[in-house]
């Protein structure tokens, strides 16, 4: 009996120790206000910042590798860190931005009837051999063998896999069509020369959708539906985009369009008609052609970053894998297909490329990792008394503006001046920065509010701050 009591006391002591440890971790990660929720503090963020140019170069290896603004800025502020050529660690801020982008994509895909699935990254070689793409893709396809000698590839795309999946459902009815299946997963491509950070890597996130329809007419209607969803997506992100006619490439099909962001470092050459907005990749239109095929107006040339691609596949894949549906007369017919890609991490990097200044990151408002950064006074300064005032403002924001919970950072590095912390906040591109300076000691207190996207700086009372932040939309 005594031994049992001893063991019980030991277990109780261990449990108490574990509880104290958990409380310690929570205390270290957050500041907790009396009677309030937890404050998210910047000092606990795993975010290497303010890397010097030589440090950034040492991460990527060669000065020639740092040829675009988004790559340089994302490395400098610690949004990404290289793991190997073409592969990057995505740091917490970046993961938050990617997750927000995926939420926006989910909203648009599900608004048109998309159903989200998840297919394996490992794809059997026999699927790719059936379409001849095992050889056609060449060295870009990352291949491997398991211990039994079976060959696989790390999928750069999933036309074969999804068509085989749908073909396995023997009782697919016309009533289930159109069928729109999509996923957001890691993709792999053995790029011969990875460059531009997340713009051209060997491992990346991609949204790929595959559609199945009962006729060519219905499939082309679905094609237009998905293209319209892409247009809405880029409009919501506040990005200027072009929909350009494009080559079908190794994916195949009979019609293809690229969604491009115009930018000087873009690797795609495009021709554009300013009159009717016709645009095409030069892969399908000879540069010597100076006249628009639609309106006969003059064509101009520009460069772009491809962030989306759509294909009308017809029955190229469904005929190989026998993906059938039963029509209203009980007949088995081949499904008409389309496939649609969005480069998730590429969209993020391309948005930073086109929106940022040379020294400071600017995000699409919806994708900013955190919407607000609150900067208290420096410890020991004349404004120290305003610390409690601005911390109470932080807590009041959490209570009064529920959509911003988890979206507001308190920069508690009070050993630094306000100016140094404002400089960091400006580099990271929080849409709003709230500063407690000397005017926070006035009655009523006034806070300096920076709107990073517009460059506007205003002084607002607590009520004014609340009114401003209430209008912030978060996904």
Swiss-Prot record:
Keyword Nucleotide-binding attached: yes
Annotated EC: 6.1.1.15
Localization per Swiss-Prot or TrEMBL: Mitochondrion matrix
Organism domain of life: Eukaryota
TM annotation in the entry: none
Catalytic activity: tRNA(Pro) + L-proline + ATP = L-prolyl-tRNA(Pro) + AMP + diphosphate
An example Gene Ontology CC term for this record: mitochondrial matrix
Pfam family, one: HGTP_anticodon
Gene Ontology biological-process entries: prolyl-tRNA aminoacylation
Transit peptide location on this chain: 1-29
GO molecular function term, any single one: ATP binding
Primary location class: mitochondrion
Family annotation (InterPro entries): aa-tRNA-synt_IIb, aa-tRNA-synth_II, aa-tRNA-synth_II/BPL/LPL, Anticodon-bd, Anticodon-bd_dom_sf, Pro-tRNA-ligase_IIa, Pro-tRNA_synthetase, ProRS_anticodon_short
SUPFAM superfamilies from the UniProt entry: Class II aaRS ABD-related, Class II aaRS and biotin synthetases
Function recorded in the entry: Mitochondrial aminoacyl-tRNA synthetase that catalyzes the specific attachment of the proline amino acid (aa) to the homologous transfer RNA (tRNA), further participating in protein synthesis. The reaction occurs in a two steps: proline is first activated by ATP to form Pro-AMP and then transferred to the acceptor end of tRNA(Pro).
Family: Belongs to the class-II aminoacyl-tRNA synthetase family.
Protein name: Probable proline--tRNA ligase, mitochondrial
Gene: Pars2
